[in-house]
Every structure is written in structure tokens, then in C-alpha cells.
Amino acid sequence: MTFIEGKTEKWEYVIGLEIHAQIKSNAKLFSSASTEFGSSPNSQVELLDAAMPGSLPVLNEFCVHQAIKTALGINAKINKLSIFDRKNYFYADLPAGYQISQFYHPIAQGGWIEILDENGNIKRIQINRLHIEQDTGKSTHDQSDTYSYIDLNRSGIALMEIVSEPDISSPMQAAEYIKKLRAILRYLDSCNGDMEKGSLRCDANISVRKPNSELGTKCEIKNLNSIKSIVRALEFEGQRQVNILESGGTVKQESLLFDATLGKTFPMRSKENATDYRYFPDPDLPPIILDQSLIDNIASSLPELPDAKIRRYINEIKLSDYNAQVLAADKDISCFFEEVIKTANPLLSANWILSELFGLMNKDGITINECKITANHFSELIQLISSKAISSKIAKTVLKEMFDSGKSPKIIMQEKNIQQISDPNQIADIIDDVLKDNYQSVVSYRNGKDRLFGFFVGQVMKKTAGNANPALINEILHTKLKQFQI
């Protein structure tokens, strides 16, 4: 747990997150309009999305299946009866004057996600509920001094709102929770998790309290769209509330926005209660009634999720806890790794992916899907290293060329005339020359200066342009130094 340092004492964070995850579907929740990102404004709008009189909603069954899959993935209980409600409020980008959501009878309740806390211990974050709702449109206020512009392309897109219990005790834990949830959604293929495209958005409820005291008044920070912003917003808001309370003030229950440039929260409006929205069942939509056979069928099709994959990597492949966590955290990286180890040593593959390949990717700011290196080519490289056909030094040079060109390691080695010297006789001759050229150093070595062994290795590597087999150098050099006539 991370405490907030006040002027007089320590305070605790109490945080709950509401995650709005866009359901991965080609069509919207109640209309057949496209959900493609980046289309021109108002080009993906049907009559229902614009709330034209007489238009009626027709439920997209696939979106319901995606929500069931997600609920199972977060260990939630599926409700066989769920009902859509109208959430009534006015906003310019909500043309109907209400949002179709699920308030009284959500599609799933309960559940949990496990994260690692600041001390590396497993912490279980409880889930309150998962419900389905439609997204609103988008308002733009910076294109004119006179008008605001409305884009309804997003209006009616299917969302899952996943609401946690207030079990999160620090901004770092909030970040870990979102990372784990996003990984689960991506493994399930129910949401792409792209926060930069608005496919995953977060509202954070935060209050502070003295240890073991009653809960304080919470504020809600709306529309956080990056993990970095979530952490910064929670840190600032926690400190702001502590400053108010320690100065004798009262925290107001309100909705806030976070200014990423200033690093501050500021009031948006007073926070509404459920009664303000006048929820009632939508008369145009029948209840969702689910058969157990459908739930069982979806459950049987679930993929291996991150936690199970981590356990398998540790228990079967014998990866370290850290390496297993990193490789399983991203679905695409995990798929790449598993393709590589079909034909290559798992431990060596993991080390080279996490150190050398990640280093190149991070430098260029690209993902594994944008990398030119295929899993088959990477596996070839690992096999060359395992068989000692090339040294680690040569392998790093080849890997960089693979990264830049996308070519296989064997083709690169042919084109660059890269070949490891593994002939013992050839290496022995080179070592003889090195020892003759450095007679005094050999004398010093034989008199106890063992550190000079590395010097001799370096001289051999220099003469061979780094292409000699290091293991053979060490073996032959030890023998030659013992036999050298002084």
C-alpha cells in the first residue's frame, strides 16, 4: 500500500475504477452502422444513431456473446436474465436524450482480477458488475469560435462497463489493474484495448481516509485515456483532498476532469446520483434471456488467459517469474514467443526476446506486429546460437540486420560473409601467434596474474574480427598457456 504524506499524518487512497471497453464488433449495439475507427465525421450513422423518430433498436447478438466471454474471463457470474434501461440526461452528443444501459439487471455481477502490488504480492481486486451500454457521440469545441461540432459516428457503439469495488489502494495498483484487464480483453478478442483510439476509457472514483477510518467523500475523474494520465490524476487528486481535509475543509462530491498539460484536476459538475438519471426499463427492448447451454458453449471456447499462461511458463518451461509475466502480458508477444519455441530453446529464446529484441523495438518505438523479424527467422537465430554455430557477438550483429531488413539470419550471414571460426586447428594457430606476440604478458600470467587471460581472449577475437568460437578459444587458450615454453 502507498500512503499519501500529509502535513500531520499519513492518508490512504481508496480507489475504484469504471472501465468503458468498446466491444470488438463490426456493427453497433442496436444498429448495423459500421464501427470502423477514423472515418469522416457522421459517415457511419443510421437513423437510430441520430434518434430519428420511429427508429427502433435491434440488439446485436454478437455483442452479447462478447460480453459473456468477457464476464467469464474476469470470473464474473452471468445473469441469465438482464434488462436494458434508459439513463436519462441531456447532452448535445446524445441525440435521444437518454443512453441505453443496464442499471437494475446487468448481464454479469461479481468477479475478480489478480494483480501484483508494490511489494510483488498477489492482490485480488473484486469486480462489482459488468453491463452493456451504448456509447455517445463526440463533441468538438475547438474548430470554431461560434459553434460546437457533433460527430455521431461513435453514437450507439457497444460498450462494456466494468466496475471494480474500491479495493485499489494506490495509483500504481490502478495502473496494474488496467494493464491486466486490458491484457485479458485482448486475449479474449472482445476489445482491442487501444486507449489512444478511445476503445478503452477510464473513470476513476477516489477518496482518502486515515488508516482504519470510515470512507471519505469520493470524487470521480472522468474520461482518462492513458495509463500515465490515470496515475498522474490519482496522485494529484489524492494530495488535493488531503490538503483540503488537513486545512479543515470538506471535500465536495463532484465530477472532475484532468488537465494533462497542467497535471491538475478541475471541476466538471457536481456528481450525480442514480436518481438524477431517472432509470427505467427500455420499452423498445425485450429482456435478454440466456440459456446455460450458450454460456457453457462460450466458456468452452475461451483461450488460455494471462494468469494461466504465466503459470505454464513458470512450471513447464521453467521461466523466471519476471520473464513469464512480461512475455504473457501481451497477447502478440506471447504468440511470437510460442511460435519461436516450437523449434528453439525456450529459456534462450526468452532471454533474447526480452533483452536484445525488446531493446531494438523500444529504440524504434514499435510493437512486435510492426517488427520485420518473423518468429521462424528468430527461431533460426536462436538455433544457431544454441548449436554454437555463431557467438553471441555475431548473433547481435545478425539480429540488428534482421531487424532492419527482415531477412533470415542465414541469408544475412551469406551476404555479409559472416562465419564463425570453429576449426580447432585454425584457432590454435591464431592463439600461438598471440602468445608469441605477447611473451611478457604470458610470463606475467604464469607468475599469477590470472586477469591477463581476458586480455589474451581479446587479442584472439581481435585477430579474427570477433568471429572465433568463444568456447573453443577458452578451452584451447587454457591448454596453450600451460604448455607455453618460457
UniProtKB/Swiss-Prot annotation:
EC number annotated for this UniProt entry: 6.3.5.-
Top-level division of the source organism's lineage: Bacteria
Catalytic activity annotation: L-glutamyl-tRNA(Gln) + L-glutamine + ATP + H2O = L-glutaminyl-tRNA(Gln) + L-glutamate + ADP + phosphate + H(+); L-aspartyl-tRNA(Asn) + L-glutamine + ATP + H2O = L-asparaginyl-tRNA(Asn) + L-glutamate + ADP + phosphate + 2 H(+)
Signal peptide: none
Cellular-component GO terms for this entry: glutamyl-tRNA(Gln) amidotransferase complex
SUPFAM superfamilies in the cross-refs: GatB/YqeY motif, Glutamine synthetase/guanido kinase
Listed GO MF terms: asparaginyl-tRNA synthase (glutamine-hydrolyzing) activity; ATP binding; glutaminyl-tRNA synthase (glutamine-hydrolyzing) activity
Alphabetical list of InterPro entries matching this protein: Asn/Gln-tRNA_amidoTrfase_suB/E, Asn/Gln-tRNA_Trfase_suB/E_cat, Asn/Gln_amidotransferase, Asn/Gln_tRNA_amidoTrase-B-like, GatB, GatB_C_1, GatB_Yqey_C_2, Gln-tRNA_amidoTrfase_suB_CS
Keywords associated with the record: ATP-binding, Ligase, Nucleotide-binding, Protein biosynthesis
GO biological process, alphabetically ordered: glutaminyl-tRNAGln biosynthesis via transamidation; translation
Subunit field text: Heterotrimer of A, B and C subunits.
NCBIfam families listed in its UniProt record: gatB (TIGR00133), PRK05477.1-2 (NF004012), PRK05477.1-4 (NF004014), PRK05477.1-5 (NF004015)
Function in brief: Allows the formation of correctly charged Asn-tRNA(Asn) or Gln-tRNA(Gln) through the transamidation of misacylated Asp-tRNA(Asn) or Glu-tRNA(Gln) in organisms which lack either or both of asparaginyl-tRNA or glutaminyl-tRNA synthetases. The reaction takes place in the presence of glutamine and ATP through an activated phospho-Asp-tRNA(Asn) or phospho-Glu-tRNA(Gln).
Family in the record: Belongs to the GatB/GatE family. GatB subfamily.
Protein name, entry field: Aspartyl/glutamyl-tRNA(Asn/Gln) amidotransferase subunit B
Organism: Orientia tsutsugamushi (strain Ikeda)
Gene for this chain: gatB
